[in-house]
Structure formats: C-alpha cells, structure tokens
Amino acid sequence: IPAEPLFRSLESWREIGGKGMKLEDEWNQILSKKNEKIKIELKNFIYNSNFDKIQKIINDEKIKYYESKPSMATRQCSSLVIESISESMPQLIGGSADLSGSNNTKTKNSKVISSKNFNGNYIHYGVREHGMAAAMNGLALYSGLVPFGGTFLIFSDYCKPSIRLSALMGLNVIYIFSHDSIGLGEDGPTHQPIEQLSGLRSIPNLNVFRPADINETLECWEIALKSKNTPSVIALSRQKLPYINPSLKNENKCALGAYQVNLTSHESRVTLIASGSEVELALETQKELKENNIDSKVVSIPCHEIFDKQNEAYKNQILEPDNIIITIEAGSINCWNKYIGAKGLSLGIDKFGESAPYKEVYNHFNLTSNKIVNLVQKMLRN
C-alpha cells in the first residue's frame, strides 16, 4: 500500500481549528439565549457530580449483596456496578475495544453512540485500544464526562502511552481491564498477563485497583469516580470468586488501600497478603494453617498506591512487621517485595503462563493452599 506524504498537514490543521472556533461561537450564541435555569443545569452537569445519590446507590447495593453473598467473576461485578449507577450519572460514557461481551462493560442501560446519533452513553471503539484510551482522555479533558473503557489486561500495553498521559494530566479516566491473570486458563501465555499489573503500578498518579469480590468492586468504583485528578485501572477476573466481605459497614474498606479480611488469633504469627482472585487463595491457606495449629491474618490490598500513602502506624497495623509476611498474586512479584520485610516472601509468577484449565495453571506455578502451607511451615521451623 503506497504511503502518501501529508503535504497539507499544517494547512489542514488550521482548517480544522477554524471549523472548531466557528462551532464554539455558534454554541455560545445558542447558550446565551437559554434561560438561567438551563445554564445552571449545564454548569452542574459539567462541574458537579451528584455523589450523594451515587453513594446511596452503592451503599444499598452493598447491603443487598451482603445478604445474598454471591460468587461471581469480578468482571460481572463491575457490570452490575455500572448498571446500578449509570442512570443516576449521565456523565458516565462507557465503551470497549471490541470486547464488550467479555469485559461486561455494556449493560442494559447502554445506548450506543454512532455517527448518526450522539445521544448515547456507549462507544464501540473497535480493535483500537490506543485510540480508545486517547479518545477517553479527550472526553475527560473538558466536558464534565467521566469515560470508562474496557479491554483485556494483557492489551493494556497498547493503551500505555495514553494511560501515562491520563496520569500526567490528572484526568478522571477509568480503565476496565478484565481477564487479569492466569485465571483465564486455556487462552495461554499470549493472553495471560504477568508483568502488566507491576508495570501499571509503576506509573505515577495512577490508582490500580484489583477487587476480590462484589463488595470491593463497588468500593473501588466509588473511589475511581471520586478521583477527580487521578485516573484508575480496575483489573477484573474472568473466573468466579467467592464473597469475602467479613462485615457490613457503610464505610469504604478499600479507601485506605488495604484492610484485614480475617484473623484467627491476635497471637497470629503469619500475615497473608493478596489482591483480587488470590484473596480466595489466602483464605483457603489460612484455613489449612489453622488446621495445623498456625494462626494467621489475611489482608486484602486492592490498591497499592492508596495503601502506600497511609501513615506508618496504619501500615504496621495491617502488615504486622514482626510476623512472617507472605504476599500472593498471580503475576510479577516486583511490586510486592516492599511489604515483606527481612523474613517474608513474595509468591507470584515471573515467567510466561501456560495453556490449561486455570486451576491446573495455578498448581503448575505452586499457587495452591497446600503448597503455601508447606512453605509457611518450613519458614516457621527455620
């Protein structure tokens, strides 16, 4: 295919700028003729979100799911959150890079935006992750809109330049990345993210959330919506996960980045820290440790960036530095070593994945409760 040089690039750029100025003038003239009520309504739409209403919806949803305690993939959890808040938040503009059905970003409240109809709230971006992320930056820059867009976590690499600019410019953009680990199973190493979470967590001013159940998903979405000057990544599982929330509270447990899920004794000698799907594994490990007369504490850390900003007293309360600290995540361990101290251990995967049913892949990489218990027993003996 011949590549034609852009001889008129500067001229075309100026033409487009002139067209934009003309459209802006026309818009301002129309707005100037509207009554004050409409002007105030527009200003509120652009600058103010009705978080009181959103907060009530989220709290009501937390109560509902505390009663039913559903087991579901967190990509499904995220879809339920979007569905519950979208009608009360018209600023929310969703989309996906050709993976709406897999990311679960499109709900029954979604109305597709097309070239013939801009009166919608959902964009089919096609297979163009970088273009999607760039477009979301544009939507967030000056419009009052809160864009979110979905793809697989492995394809976040295609979004990376625009994610970096979201963070650099301090934009309220929400990236929905599903299929977040070896838990996706048979698709194998080409689709199993290993280094992606660690890489995303290294970007300044970017909150990377990895919720473990519906309660954490609701809370991570709440934080992301309120983060006016910080973009968010919400990494979600393909596989079903159990409900792990220990108690019903209106307060946001994820708001400090990490919290205690379960404690078998105040004399615990081991702290098990995990995120997302591995919180289930930590709880299974805790149960087996207790059967072997070893008390432990399970901590969920849905957001490193927020937890790292807490004071030392809270960090010590959560981590208990005198304990043997074991971190568990089905991905690169690079971003976990800061938590383990001198005698702890980070468990994860620092090689490419394998194609097999997901439980077999976890076993292959020694991420099972039985293997972790044996490891803890050996560490305690030493």
Please identify what each model-predicted range represents.
Residues 2-4, 93, 100-197, 217, 219, 226-382:
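Thiamine diphosphate
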Residues 2-128, 138, 271, 275, ...:
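Conserved acidic/glycine
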Residues 3, 7-15, 141-144, 168-169, ...:
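Conserved thiamine diphosphate
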Residues 81-88, 95, 102, 135-142, ...:
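Generic, well-ordered alpha-helical scaffold segments in large soluble proteins
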Residues 95-96, 125, 148-149, 175-177, ...:
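General beta-strand structural signal in soluble alpha/beta enzymes
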